[in-house]
A protein has these predicted regions:
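Short amphipathic alpha-helical surface patches that mediate protein-protein
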Residues: 33-37, 50, 261, 324, ...
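Non-catalytic terminal/interface segments that mediate subunit docking, oligomerization
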Residues: 36, 40, 49-99, 103-105, ...
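Residue-level signal for secondary-structure boundary elements
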Residues: 24, 28, 40-44, 57, ...
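Short, hydrophobic beta-strand segments that form beta-sheet elements in well-ordered domains
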Residues: 38, 154, 176, 664-667, ...
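Mobile "lid/hinge" segments at catalytic clefts and subdomain interfaces of large enzymes
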Residues: 65-326, 332, 336-341, 345, ...
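N-terminal amphipathic, basic-rich helices that act as targeting or association modules
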Residues: 2-71
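Glycine-/charge-enriched secondary-structure boundary and capping motifs
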Residues: 1-6, 10-12, 16-18, 23-29, ...
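Alpha-helix N-cap/helix-start motif at coil-to-helix transitions, marked by capping-box chemistry
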Residues: 7, 234, 597-600
Length: 716
């Protein structure tokens, strides 16, 4: 077997020989090749990921574990992470998406947390194509089928359409769970003499080499790679969840690791390396679905619904009894040692022996970066072409566009209320769930700005992060931490690596400026084909805390007679907006970078507004601009509005510009003076009043609310 067959470069192979002092055998080469793959090693992004701020007063566990954990107070932690399942979902939409949900749930289990929340970020191609509709149908059905059956509510997400995702749909699965602080688990606490126990499904050939599959661009051969797609069983996962929760409650587990990419290999080598131990694996003891599997197939299989437990000898018997109670396979497959060696035995014969460091301390690559030659063209914009001759018509066309209309067809397939702790779910700007046994609430926002990242990677990523935080602050939640899924094309092309590097710089700078640590994340590269590539798509999910869940501000609660306020600058930028893209047919123009001081001023006042309950309803100005924010609020509340704001220049800038710390609030007249006082020192203007059955903007447009609602709920 040659090194190129396992995805290694010549320089990497030479480095392996130097580290080992010999040439690896075929099995060792397979093991190293997978662990050094982009998907497992993050070799192209680790230097950049280290620039993220990772410490904060609420951070209990930062990057480097199965998921990040933040402190929710009253003895509760919140474990959360988002992860990609892009390539598998492009090849087998239903199973690819379903197993993406299952995999991220097991990351949460591995922290000792009960999975309590799921969300998904979905990026599809041209909505008018039958191919896109087929992919979207399979992906959404896969998510709903698995999530509903396993009993974890899907409480929100983000869905975005653009032709750049025609051949590369993105499926970013988020999961989270609550854990008592004294029951947190870790993958770094194994000790020599402990036993490695495989719990869950038998190992088969599904998903073999899935990590390598996800480390290269999609082509016709890879699209035919069905064996590299895992097959999920949500009912087995449900049993696995309950068994692991019981084992943790009884303190029977010393350490734990999900079996995700690279299966048994990655889980066992990561536990050994992180714990400073070695491990001896007995391959013949691994329960198999197919008797003729070769050692490399067994180690690289990504069969689902499996966990690797590290168990002290005296606790083996109750662990096996618990597994039997739940009807799960359970087997001792290895033992921790003090050798710092990763050894594979088959029937007593040593098949492979490697230092754990060669599997855990993988090499890094800092690719050359060069500004794309067409970046100035991407940023050029002719404002005269964007003039709105008929604002009412433009608004009615934007609301039903793929990125504007309600996503009921997706949400209705998801169970958002199972577990009975969802306060605000799909269709609301922020998801809100109860913290168990307290009066607290956890708030989650998910954002991505592909258009803006395409025309200006640094500013686009900064705006996505700031937008996610604004959504938290408006509800009354202070940010505890962020997780991200970084979806990009090949890092090997300097212009594409520039986009990656600048997006990550934008995220890091914004998180640092606005005091939001990064606690976990995922990187997905090579999202491209021979003919197309995705826009840079960093997706962020931010978690926040409300101490009193009765003091949150939600959208869609405007009442007749309320004053409508706009806080923040009346106008933003038209560059790379939903309106601009609709007019020009492609994203063009730059957006304004977030102003850290303005963002902090917005944060402080938004938190005060929620704590004092000075508004009945609130909504951040985001995609589609001020007109979309007000129209969505009127539709959701079932009440008309009369808006009196006058444009400074072109009406399209007032109505449809995006960016900046801006929001609309609905305030009862008796609280108006106190609301205005709370926003003193920050732009705040009374924009109009709620009431009636029409959405009117004085001198600009008048539309029946019924017509507006119909446009919003119809697909264009």
């Amino acid at each position: 077997m040659g090194f190129r067959e396992v995805g290694l470069s010549e320089s990497e192979y030479k480095r392996i020989i130097e580290l080992l002092g010999r040439e690896p055998n075929d099995l060792e080469l397979e093991l190293i090749g997978v662990m050094w793959s982009e998907h497992c090693s993050y070799k192209s992004t680790r230097p950049l990921l280290r620039t993220f701020p990772s410490k904060g007063k609420y951070v209990l566990q930062g990057q480097g574990e199965n998921a990040g954990v933040v402190d929710m107070g009253e003895g509760w932690g919140f474990a959360f992470k988002v992860e990609s399942h892009n390539h598998p979902s492009a090849v087998a939409p239903f199973q690819g998406a379903a197993t993406g949900v299952g995999g991220i749930i097991r990351d949460i289990i591995a922290m000792g947390a009960r999975p309590s929340v799921s969300m998904d970020g979905l990026f599809f191609g041209d909505a008018s194509l039958q191919k896109t509709r087929n992919l979207a149908k399979g992906i959404v059905e896969g998510i709903g089928s698995y999530g509903n059956a396993v009993g974890v509510p899907i409480v929100g997400g983000k869905t975005f359409y653009s032709p750049c995702y025609n051949d590369n749909p993105l499926v970013n699965a988020f999961s989270a769970g609550f854990v008592r602080l004294d029951k947190m688990a870790s993958s770094q606490t194994a000790k020599p003499g402990d036993y490695a126990v495989l719990l869950g499904s038998k190992t088969g050939r599904d998903g073999i080499a899935g990590a390598s599959f996800a480390s290269r661009e999609l082509d016709e051969d890879s699209k035919a790679s069905k064996p590299q797609i895992q097959i999920g069983d949500p009912f087995e996962e449900k049993l696995l969840i309950e068994c692991c929760m019981d084992l943790l409650d009884k303190k029977l587990i010393a350490s734990m690791q999900d079996m995700g990419a690279a299966g048994i290999l990655s889980s066992s080598s990561e536990i050994a390396h992180k714990s400073g131990c070695g491990i001896d694996i007995q391959v013949e003891k691994i329960p198999l679905r197919e008797a003729d599997m070769l050692p490399w197939e067994i180690f690289l299989s990504e069969s689902q619904e499996r966990m690797l437990l590290i168990v002290e000898e005296e606790k083996l018997e109750p662990v096996f009894a618990m597994a039997k109670h739940y009807g799960l396979d359970c087997a001792i497959v290895g033992e921790m040692t003090d050798s710092k060696r990763y050894r594979v035995y088959k029937n007593g014969v040593l098949e492979a022996e490697l230092p754990t460091s060669i599997l855990g301390d993988t090499p890094e690559i800092l690719w050359p970066a060069a500004e794309p030659k067409d970046l100035p063209a991407r940023q050029a914009i002719e404002l005269s072409k964007l003039a709105s001759a008929d604002p009412a018509k433009d608004l009615l066309e934007m609301l039903p566009c793929p990125n504007g209309h309600r996503k009921d067809a997706i949400w209705e397939q998801y169970d958002s209320m199972v577990q009975l702790h969802t306060i605000a779910g799909p269709g609301e700007p922020a998801a809100i769930v109860e913290v168990p046994d307290t009066h607290r609430a956890c708030v989650l926002t998910m954002e991505a700005e592909p258009y803006k990242c395409w025309t200006d990677p640094y500013t686009g990523a900064s705006e996505a992060m700031a937008l996610s935080l604004r959504g938290l602050w408006l509800t009354g939640a202070d940010a505890l931490g962020m997780t991200n899924c970084l979806n990009f094309a090949s890092p090997e092309v300097p212009e594409k690596f520039y986009e990656l590097k600048e997006c990550l710089r934008g995220l890091a700078d914004t998180c640092r400026a606005l005091d939001c640590p990064v606690v976990s994340g995922n990187v997905s590269l090579y999202n491209e084909t021979a003919t197309d590539r995705i826009y840079p798509t960093p997706l962020v999910v931010t978690a926040g805390l409300v101490v009193d869940r009765d003091r949150v501000i939600r959208a869609g609660r405007t009442k007749a007679g309320d004053f409508i306020y706009l806080v923040g600058a009346p106008e933003g930028s038209l560059g790379a907006t939903r309106y601009q893209q609709a007019k020009d047919g492609k994203p063009l123009g730059k957006t304004a970078a977030p102003d850290a001081e303005a963002e902090k001023a917005f944060r402080d006042r938004a938190l005060k507004t929620a704590q004092r309950q000075l508004a009945n309803s609130g909504r951040v100005v985001a995609g589609g601009g001020l007109a979309s924010a007000l129209a969505n609020e009127a539709i959701a509340s079932g009440v008309g509005m009369d808006i009196e704001l006058a444009p400074r220049g072109g009406v399209e800038t007032l109505l449809f510009s995006e960016g900046g710390a801006r929001a609309v609030y609905a305030v009862s007249p008796e609280k108006a003076a106190e609301f205005e006082a709370a926003w003193s020192g920050f732009p705040c203007v009374k924009a109009g009043k709620a009431g009636g059955d029409k959405f009117s903007w004085q001198g600009i447009l008048t539309l029946p609310l019924e017509e507006l609602a119909k446009a919003f709920t119809e697909e264009k």
